[in-house]
Structures are given as structure tokens and as C-alpha cells.
A protein has these predicted regions:
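Short juxta-domain linker segments that transition from a proline/glycine-rich
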Residues: 1-284
């Protein structure tokens, strides 16, 4: 949100010039102005009185293009996340906890789904988990220096990522179900790790990467068998319990990609029309 947009959101009660002076510390807002600004930004009043000690660039937060977040919500989330990250890192500093992030895949360029899957398998190998189910995505990634912050927000926000003091930070909505939260964490990790070639849809590659991290394609085929032309909901639910993957478009997409089910079967499992399934699968 620009200074002028913020000014407009408070019906001109604060001028862009005044906002600029507040930001530079040249002038202090009155209590009435603080209340107006906190309401406009959806932030608590104490946010404005906390000095930042951690260098975080809010402009580097990325949000999914198809999300329903308006500019006001985006700015509110950015500032909330910066505050939460700062508190998180301050606590670690007090406790003497140090972290180092060692995963570097900058020498790999993702040009399509195959490379995204290979990168996911490389990550699994580097984390020494083979093809096993991931018990806790948060615990696993925090052991290699990834900071994961959960914030309280409505369903319009799922996740985002950034860097702070040289460490990757992933932010997720604490109110999501565990399966969606796990998928979002690895989707955002894809944004942090993956370098995509020009013209490649990074959002789609991050989905492919996240799916493959959660359950490798070969493992999925081993679980359901190589030659199948159908799959039951009971089987999908068993895989859900073991691998923490929701029985929705993710699992159906994996089964469809493995040529286990047809569009019509996917539609039946998802309670959608065939055309809706086509659209859903094309987005993943």
C-alpha cells in the first residue's frame, strides 16, 4: 500500500506528507491518528511503538496471484509477519540459539515438472529421509535453519516467504488444516530454493515440488501398484493418514498423473463436474 493509498483508506484524515514524516521519524502522530492508522492497517497499537532490530525487507514477500487478498490485507500481513519474525529471532538470541541454512540449489535451473520433481528428491536425500513419510514439516525444516512462523488470519491467506538475517522464513496461516499447512510450507520452500527458467510458471512448479516432497511419485506408485485403472476413497484415506496429504485435488492429481484414474473418476471423488476437474488439474 502506497502512502497515497493509505491516505485514501483513512478518508484523507492523514496526508501523504505526514505519513512520510512519520515513517522517517521526523514527526510523531497524535493518539487519534495512531488509532486511525492502526484500524486502516489492521494492526494493534503496540506495533507502532516497537523498534525494529531485525532487517527485513517487506517488499520481498510474495503472494499467490490467484489469492483474494486486497492491498490493505497484504500490507497488514507484511507488517504483522515482520513483527512476528522479529520476536521469534529475539527469543532465539536470548536463548543463545544459532542457526545456519545450508541448502543451496542455485546451480539448478528448473525448466519443467521433471526438474521440479528431481529437486524435491534431492531435498529428501539431503534431509536423509529417503521415501519415508514426513512426520513434522516444521520440525524437519527448522533443523536445517528454516524459520517457520504461523499467524492467525482468515482463509484468504495461506502462506508467503522471505529472508531475515540470512535465513529463509516461511509464514503460514495457523488456521489451515494440517494437510494444507504441510503443502503450503513446502510450496513456499520451493519459492525459496527454486530457480526457474524464463517463461516457466513458478507457482505450478512449486506445487509439483511440494507434492513430490510430501510423497515421491515412485513411492505413490509402489503403494497403489503399477498397473491400475481405478482407486478407492478408502485407499486414498490410508495414504492421507500415513503421509499427511489431503484427499482432494492433490491426491487425485497424483493419481490422475499416474494414469490410475480418469477425469470422470476424479470428478466423482472431488464431487465436481468433469470440466471443473480439468480446470483444477491444469492449475496444479
Amino acid at each position: 500500500m502506497s502512502q497515497r493509498e493509505l491516505c485514501n483508506s483513512v478518508d484523507g484524515k492523514v496526508s501523504p506528507t505526514a505519513i512520510a514524516k512519520y515513517e522517517k521519524g521526523l514527526m510523531m502522530p497524535s493518539s487519534d491518528v495512531l488509532i486511525v492508522l492502526s484500524n486502516a492497517l489492521n494492526m494493534k497499537l503496540d506495533y507502532f511503538f516497537r523498534p525494529y532490530t531485525i532487517d527485513i525487507d517487506p517488499s520481498k514477500f510474495e503472494f499467490r496471484k490467484k489469492s483474494n487478498l486486497g492491498s490493505k490485507k497484504v500490507e497488514s500481513i507484511k507488517h504483522l509477519v515482520c513483527s512476528e519474525i522479529e520476536k521469534y529471532l529475539e527469543i532465539e538470541a536470548i536463548l543463545g540459539i544459532t542457526s545456519k541454512f545450508c541448502l543451496d540449489y542455485s546451480n539448478t535451473t528448473v525448466e519443467g515438472e521433471n526438474e521440479a520433481k528431481l529437486l524435491a528428491l534431492r531435498l529428501r536425500n539431503d534431509l536423509n529421509i529417503g521415501s519415508d513419510a514426513i512426520v513434522s514439516a516444521i520440525d524437519l525444516l527448522e533443523t536445517v535453519g528454516v524459520k517457520i512462523i504461523e499467524i492467525d488470519h482468515d482463509s484468504s491467506f495461506s502462506g508467503t516467504c522471505n529472508e531475515a538475517v540470512g535465513l529463509p522464513v516461511i509464514v503460514v496461516n495457523k488456521n489451515m488444516c494440517s494437510e494444507r499447512k504441510r503443502l503450503t510450507i513446502f510450496h513456499e520452500l520451493g519459492h525459496l530454493l527454486m530457480h526457474c527458467a524464463d517463461g516457466v510458471d513458478k507457482e505450478k512448479m512449486c506445487n509439483v515440488f511440494a507434492n513430490e516432497v510430501l510423497i515421491p511419485s515412485d513411492k505413490f506408485k509402489n503403494l497403489i501398484g503399477e498397473s491400475r485403472h481405478d482407486i478407492s476413497l478408502v485407499e486414498l484415506q490410508a495414504i492421507q493418514r500415513e503421509y499427511g496429504i489431503s484427499v482432494d485435488a492433490l491426491m487425485v492429481n497424483r493419481a490422475f498423473a499416474s494414469e490410475v484414474i480418469s477425469y470422470s473418476k476424479a470428478a466423482a471423488l472431488l464431487d465436481m463436474s468433469v470440466n471443473e476437474v480439468r480446470d483444477t488439474l491444469n492449475l496444479m
